[in-house]
Curated annotation (Swiss-Prot):
Biological function: The capsid protein self-assembles to form an icosahedral capsid with a T=2 symmetry made of 120 subunits.
Primary location group: virion
Phylogenetic lineage: Viruses, Riboviria, Orthornavirae, Pisuviricota, Duplopiviricetes
Keywords: Capsid protein, T=1 icosahedral capsid protein, Virion
Nucleotide-binding is among the record's keywords: no
Recorded GO CC terms: T=1 icosahedral viral capsid
Subcellular location: Virion
Official protein name in the record: Capsid protein
Biased composition (Low complexity): 30-41
Superkingdom classification of source: Viruses
Region (Disordered): 1-66
Amino acid sequence: MNQDTPLANLNGPEVPSGNVPPANPPGRTNVAPPAQGAVQQPPAPAARRARNPHGPVPPAGPSRSAGAPAMLELSAAYPMYTEQRRAPNYYVPDAQLLFHTLGVCDQLMTTTDRFLRSMPSWLPIVSQLYVSVLWNVMILKVYVNTGYGAAYAHDLDVLLNHLQINECMIPGPLVPFFQSLAAVNGPFDWIGDIIPAMPSFTELWTDEFAPHAAYARQIPIPAILLDQLYRFATLAFDAQLQTNYATFEWYSNIFNQDVNTHNARLRLGPQLCGSLFTTQAQCDSARAFWNPAFANGFTRIDAANGPLMAFPQLLGFISQDGALQSNWFMHISLIMHKYAQYFNGSVPLKSISPVGIGASVIYGTPLEDTNVRDWLYPAAAAIAPFRSTRFLPRRELPATLAVRFAHADHEIEEQAEQYSILCHTNMKWYVNNATQNNHTAIEGNYIHQGEYWNFTPFRYSPPVSLKTQFAQVIASRYHQQAANRAE
């Protein structure tokens, strides 16, 4: 035996008497110092999940799993499957808080001398008409982009590629409202997409020459606003007065029908949540511009001349006899391009993404309140015609309006919740406040369609009341007394 070979230990290897000392950890590599002069920003947090809508997808068949040994082979012959609920979940966006916010902007602009001198043709109803067009176009843009709004694809193509509405500027304070419309996929793979939608023309516009009762408060109809601007500009007045400032009444005659003839739902639109107040000087200068502007190439809608037949007529771009009329929008877009320069954060419509934020999954429910009920279902006197001397909106948001927001998405980001709470674009007005004053009740199946809206929510907000808080932020953070330079 080799003398260098150790003898075997018959009792086995020795057991250590203590713990094994830990291995030496690798040394820490220090982070390289930032380059001098470089901007240091924290990385943006990644989204918790992909937000792009799935689009129309056929239901999946039952899944198959591998067999199991022994007794489990009996149940393996009956594999479970996921029930696909991929039907889309629609909601009709609400624009009432949007126009309240626009009303705050308009109040600031009535005292912005540089703007008024450069745009004597501006009036608050011009702002309302412009925003109502952009709002409808944005809804169509999202709806068609998801693959579900094919019926509106041609109309959208004309609006974006021929009228170039994608280039129109959105005033900064209104940008979050447009961003909140983005479509998203459902909270689970087997839940359908959640999409803001536009009702079909026959659902939106009734044979009574008025919007459907469920949509009258939520969807602005540009044709109604255009009709009022035309009547303001062309209605004759007493030559001795030299002005119609103290005599002209908004909404006293709509589509050539007076207040006792036209449907009262024409006076429930969301634009009436904003004020039409202006000074006499601005009123007179605007009329001097719009009177000749409407002289050629425009025909006013007349309810006596037969029903409207297509959605572009509600936007004001097609007359009752089918003729294209878009000169009025050219004037308005020029005015509002200058208007947007007086607000920080203004962006073109084309910059708003149709997918991604996630605010669409969150909905608000108003608390029961007498003032809110009177606002939703007003008495005739509360929606009567009014003059430009009236400072308050005709349908002013009630100060007691409180809304509780909720959703059933387990991965939604807090920023999406903030967008929804701020903008109030997904609302269940049909809950908690019953109809009155002979109004037709708002029915939920017209506003929300799809199984997601029936899921039990698990995230809630406290009651939210933002009406009086917009003015401070807009005045201090957005509005400028001098126009921002175009980039």
